[in-house]
């Protein structure tokens, strides 16, 4: 018995030592991994940046991370640390489009901390997005910008791209574990409207299997600017946008030719509805740019519309491919040997930086469905999405974005409809005293239109887009002093934020802003007649109670209250209800869209009370207010558009590309 006890105790002791040794080994491995990761991250530190302005250099890291070892697939990143921490840590990932266009466009021409004054000189970007968030630019997919891969291994599918990106993030967080618990936002523009939802879906799937080793990532929101999301609505928007901007006049031979091509496009989409790109539809934009070209510019060449900003003209057939003007400095700057060295570019990257790699675009031939099919599930998973548009962009224009929102069903509703016949109000946005656009919001989706802006909204208005970002992220900077910016919706001053280099006052009262939004929604209900119905129901209930009491008095069964006077009869007619263009018609892309230019008042068409017979008396008219035609609410027929970028030498934007 004693021997048995001794043996048992010895066994337990041995088991305890095994457990302890396992814990020690795990701790040692963890410590070693952390040490290796820390040492590895130091290799990515950017010690200096040629041409940077005087003063402290923004803390940054850059370099390559291998994602597909079998074919040398490496993604390049450039990370900028936030200048301030406001109530929580946040990281914003930025992606440009193409497919195959470098995110260094975003870093040096849009939202990064620096912009190029010329090819040798950097200046601070007033409105950079790294004020209250770390910003991570990634050249995605492999082969784009500074990223590289074997020439026979370009990706073909969106799911493949997303898997590579998740691998990148896992290895990036292993190098920089201090950011893995950040609120994570994914932002970008143009063809990134396909990439971002697929990456988000892959992250959500990964999070389902998260554990002690694979930590859950705090995916907190998506921002897509002038995105290519839903081909059906966006191809259909080309011609509609051209009509509204007077690029093409209805009834002309040119209009008839383009309408024929549009019908060919629509037929192809009807037959094959799940594609992302259609040559028959790309031809609408190509033909439009060619057939509207005319006049001779300073270069002696015919002039065509800039497809990224229709207020501008360009030499045909460039039509915007050399735009924006900063691009002429970005390419030579990123090809400088000292810049390549500073950004820790691998020697395996044998070719110089190009804005858009045509090989990436030509090899990308996805069979996966357009990203519009993913948005409802992402929204229902609790991930907020913000879509924003520049009003002067042709290729991915705002009409198409508004149409795809109007036709999309998510979180128990369709489009921005709050209840049948009642639409979320469009709230006029002024920024520092100037009309900036409008905001519209419902069920976790936000839409922002920027007046007087192009395909690359942050290029035009970095300060306004920073204000948009901070509000979307719910930045609370109450602990930081400074002069706040003046940003208002419907004339009401918003919770205070800051843009540019100076810190702002406070955005702590996010609840107050939500309350204002609820008030605006209630105003929409009131205008549409919903409030009248509520009053009638309540009044009918009160009247019924008085009738019951009087009957009990007459029967001698009730108590005797205050002496009663005349009974008041309450009509059960709820009064006029805002029909909202025939109720469901607007949600099918019909209704009042043809009359959007008729509006001259401040109220939303969807929220106004009117008799349906008045539709017969409406006529098209051109508003004098340059913003009037931009304020109609989502829910009617509207279109958006996309772009192609023909070659322009070594940094060519390829046909069909949306950067």
UniProtKB/Swiss-Prot annotation:
It holds the Pfam family Peptidase_S10. It catalyses: Preferential release of a C-terminal arginine or lysine residue. Residues 649-659 have a biased composition (Polar residues). GO terms for cellular component: membrane; trans-Golgi network. Protease with a carboxypeptidase B-like function involved in the C-terminal processing of the lysine and arginine residues from protein precursors. Promotes cell fusion and is involved in the programmed cell death. One of its GO terms (molecular function) is serine-type carboxypeptidase activity. The gene is kex1. The keyword Protease applies. This is Pheromone-processing carboxypeptidase kex1.
